[in-house]
Amino acid sequence: MSWMKINPRSMKRALSTVANSLAVFAGLLILWQLVLLIFRVPAYMLPSPWAVARSVVSRAPTLATAFTITGEEALGGLMASVVAGAAIALVFAQSRWIRRMLYPYTLLLQTVPIVAIAPLILMWVGAGTASVTLIAFIISLAPIIANTTQGLVSVEENMVHLFLMHNATPAQILFKLRLPHAIPSLFVGIRVASGIAVIGAITGELYAGSSRVGEGGLGYSILYASSQLQTDFLFALVFAATLLGFAFFFSVMFLEWWFLHRWHESARTPDAG
Amino acid sequence: MTTEFVAPAVELTGVTARYGNGANVLEEVDLTIGKGEFVSIIGPSGCGKSTLLKLISGLTLPSKGMIRVDGMTPKNARETISYIFQDATLLPWRTVHRNVALALELEGASTERRKQKTAALLELVGLREVAGAYPRELSGGMKMRASIARALATNPRLLLMDEPFAALDEMSRDRLNEEILRLRTEQKWTAVFVTHSVAEAVFLSSRIIVLAPNPGRIYQDLSVDLPQPRTADLRSAPEFDAFVSRVSHTLRASRSL
């Protein structure tokens, strides 16, 4: 397959990018260690990089479990908002009137602070992954609705005219024109939503983290580690959370590229242009 | 001898079209286009050239007057009309082949017929080699060829073209002008062609309608009595130049009305 072909020049560039990032990372570690040495910070305030690394290794199973739980919650929430968001966008695309009437509510969805409604959800759904997934879903829904609707309604007038001239049915205009046209915008929405879904899942866990004591996702474990002053583990969890965010972002980027690179300008690989 | 009544390809009677603000884009337009004619519509901007095409296609409705295409209302006649837009309006997510097949697909043609017809048309417009390419990989001229192929796929009797070559460089434009005439020798469609270019209008048409602006109306109806069939050589003939300058003159006069 053509996408698997590796261009030596871009390979070299990718390697040097990785090398640069690693150099920055090494620099930060050295700085971190220096701060510890110079200011004599106690370990419960700031553990050494070495202590964090040790914590990562010794508590790897717990970390992996927390990572997986949060990942599943965020993914569940995100997938639900893709399905629901696309469906809502389809309704919105039907008429300007519907959009005017309902759009303010999606704005509401975006502006309501999740920390304010989390206790309610906890009350209604109960603690555990279901409420956390629901929180991730609610918080990541708005960008998908907004971007997909935009994509559905921004079809050029002449394209619609072309379809009309060939006696296209409304269903044909929707499925052969508006939907494919909206896919790049849908992906923009998913990209934004994926980051928010991870944040939503972690925040959700702070409130509705676990139905069982001692076992939960990253948010729950962060809360737990901080209450126990296990700062090294706390750091390990923060890294895991960052990694999760990255994993989501790059997975969406890859999917976007996979679906669009053949025809869409924005999804071209940098070395193709 | 029996005389059979043949409906003209296009007939407009007392057609007035209004903007949203109430001003007339076109006022009291009477126009009859016979079958097999190649009519160019030319005129200063704002004279309602594109509106005229939209009216004939039924995409816009007149506020007054009557429009008939082949004796039918524009909407009922749609199966016999194809429209070529200024931008090629290719679907970027479809390959050239699937773009050309689109019109047939929408009209419910069988897969077999679609394949056959599309392949033949791609051959005809010289795009066989790039059938599997996506529009973004094509030059402007190639995109327009694909757009033409798509329009011809449904065997139209009337082809409406809204400045289809305006965005192309002069060489591609000249080549496509010749192609359009060549394609017409195989399928004898009637053409209504909107353009800004006097030379293009003269080269292609059997008749040129010059519109005047504010409100848009027919200013002059010129028949182009240059020899048929037209070939590239015509462009360097003195009578071609003479006709072009005559039309340019009329066009200038229409603007200063």
List the predicted regions and their residue ranges.
Chain B
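A short, flexible loop at the N-terminus of ABC-type nucleotide-binding domains that lies
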Residues: 4-9, 17-28, 35
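The feature captures the beta-strand-to-loop junction immediately N-terminal to the Walker
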Residues: 42-44
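Helix-to-loop junction immediately C-terminal to a conserved catalytic motif
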Residues: 57
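Conserved ABC transporter NBD signature motif
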Residues: 65-77
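Short coil-to-helix segment of the ABC ATPase nucleotide-binding domain corresponding to the Q-loop/switch region
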Residues: 94-101
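Conserved ABC ATPase "signature" region
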Residues: 101, 105, 112-129, 182
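Conserved signature/switch motifs of ABC ATPase nucleotide-binding domains
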Residues: 133-136, 150, 154
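Catalytic Walker B motif of ABC-type/P-loop ATPase nucleotide-binding domains
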Residues: 159-162
